[in-house]
Each structure stands twice: as C-alpha cells, then as structure tokens.
C-alpha cells in the first residue's frame, strides 16, 4: 500500500497536479483515502528520491525537476465514458467528432473507451491496464460515476471532467451549466403563475443530476415565505417506458404539476408525446421545459422551450482547452458554459391564473441565464 501511494504521488508530481508545494497531510490523506502512517511512509520514499525538500514550519517544497514540460508526453487524448459512443446524444457525438478533428490537426489522436461505472476488482484491473504510464496525455471523463472520477483523481492523472464534477472531488470540469438553467426555468415558470412544478431526472449516479435537483430545491427555499413551494422531483429508470411510467404517475397525483422541467432532451420529447397522446394540451393544460437541447428538437411541434448553445462554439472551446491541457500538462481551470433560453411554445399560465411579477431573486424569462448563475 505504501509503494502504491508513492506511485500515485509520483504521477501527480509528473503531471503537474501540484505546483510549488505539496498540500498538507490531512488533505492528501483524504484525497488518496489512506491513513496518515501510510501517507508519511510514501512521502518518506519521495523525499529520499529528491522530489521535495522539507523546511521547518513550511509545507514540503517541490523540487524544480518536477516541471511537467520536461517530461515526454503522449500524443493520445483518451475519453472514458459510461456509454459507448453510438449511445450518446446526437449533439454529444457531434462534439466528439469536432474534438477528434481538432485534435488530429494539432498532432493528437482521440481514443474512446466505454467502461462500467462500478469500481469492482475486475474494473480496477481494466482501469489499471488502460492507464499504464504515458498511455494518454490527458483523460476526459464523460458521464462517469463518483467512483470512476475519484479513481482518476486519487492517481493524480491529468483529468478533465466533461460535465459536472462530483461534490468533494477536486477535478477541473467543462460543462453546460444545467443548475443555472434549472434556476432560470423555475423563475420563468413562477412568473407565469406556476406553483406546482415537477422535475424529471434520470435515476443515474452522475453529478449533473444531483446538481440540478439541488439547485431547484435551493431556489425554492430562497423564495419569500409567501411564494415558497415544494418542488415535485421524480427519478425515472430511463427509456421511453421508464419516462412514461413516471409521467403518468405525476399526472395522476391529486394536485398534479402544472409545469414540468425535464433534464434530458430525449426524455422531454417522450414527455411531450405522452402528454399529447393522452390529450393534455401543451401549454394550455401543462407547461414543459427541457434543460438541454439536441438536434432533433428543431423538428418538435409545438416547439419545446429549452436551453441551448451553439454546438460548434461549444466544441471549439472544449477542443481548445483539451489541446492546451494535452500539450502543457498544466491543470486547466474549470469552465461553465451558460446556455441561452429559447422560449418555444410550451410555456403558458395555469388555468385561472393571471400573469404575475417574479418574486425577489427569481429571474424572469426576459433575463439571461447568467442572472441565474450568480
């Protein structure tokens, strides 16, 4: 265990995870999930190797030889995902295609790996063989569980999360800010008079779902006492049948929601079809908002209210960050991309409710999503 911990620390130093000085022992012990005695034994090995110097009253100062630019770097960028490429959304596939094209133009190749998201013994062995030394200049994690994100973080591998990073983990991320979009959507619906608002999320182990639900609940709590409401949050098992089952159960409630916020665009389309099939008028009987966009949504009628961004610009920004990371090894800063609100034709007022002004702190549909990101 001591030698394994020393190897993880060496990888972190080699990839530039720490600059100038090492974090304190408490932080490293929590980060690597090892005891203080194991950590100190591993640090003693690195000290003998000259990785850092110890000065009384100061943290361990890293030696100049640990400059990552002095190390040979791989020309591979590896994407690790819970899904095979063909099961990703159309917009995600376009993003990966553009990323591959731009990486190739910069002298890198893109490799795509789909892996189980449970970290069992067999999965650990597969991951260990995948990340052998110099196998990739950097790793991009897409739709990965907290176990997989923690595994990469603990080994100090040069890692960028495409999406949200799980709470308590210290990895840079590049994401569309779904939490800000959710807060904005709540404000828009609230302004239209909705007080029974439902949120449909996939029952998944991914950080984006957790952040989105938390943002909705926090925004509801931040409303004034007279305006406060309890959101109706439901998780579905995925697929058309799973989404329809949860939607039907919501509509059978004694006080069904007058508006639904749906996280994933394919699920929003399923909800829209289910509502129309069962003769719910959208938006007269119920309003509907999707927190993400996809190419097929251009063909939906009525036009779905949703949050979208220019996918070419998004892919270009992602590629620029990944290429710089792969070339330099320097840990990039996290980037949250704010989508634009497209009102579509699926938001209306509940029957018998007049248009109202938004409560204090609640963004209206005339405000940008940036107002909800603050």
Show where each model-derived region lies.
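Periplasmic-binding protein-like
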Residues: 78-79, 133-143, 198-201, 254-267, ...
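An alpha-beta-alpha
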Residues: 185-224, 333-348
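Flexible loop/hinge segments that line or gate small-molecule binding clefts
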Residues: 143-181, 266, 292-304
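Extreme N-terminal segment that seeds HTH/winged-HTH DNA-binding domains in transcriptional regulators
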Residues: 1-37, 41-44, 68-69, 86, ...
